[in-house]
């Protein structure tokens, strides 16, 4: 925190905005430093606007590709040092705080869940999971898929298991540990979860992207709740524990 500027923190689905813009600004700063060194050392003090980087190679914008070309590693070699612990590196840093207008945008998601409900025991089993997510430009497909699936797991856990039990006399939490506070395990969620991306372009997000923190959780809760209703014909209070399912079905 000594070198981190003040911010609202990684919350409210703002991480893509805050970290994304900061990373992009830092990368642009590092690129600027790299081109300054390259222009001075290899291109006769060429201006920044006259240089470009293509696939790790620094070159003049308006010259044929066969002309002077220098790799990034060669540029960094200029910074070499014989001092132990010194490395040839450039550190990029964003120069200004991110404007407040770039910290929020709505995200959209829908999830579909197939469940099996045992009407005798009230047990709910998740059979299939499909999600559609619009979080702007998909910067990293695998990371976004993991985020959506993780949100779906969290939402399903809220719908089926997770709740705090309080002592009626003292108000103390009675299940304040992972032995008594039930969570979904890997085996409880469909292993072949499918995520579809509906890409759009967010005008204020980094590269048109926006967050995906909360919508997968909210969609997961409602998807499981409605799937149980479609299977049983009754609405069950959340979390839909076996006891509550049996009671809703008139078995208790």
Name each region found by the language model.
Residues 1-252:
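C-terminal catalytic domains of large/alpha subunits in multi-subunit enzymes
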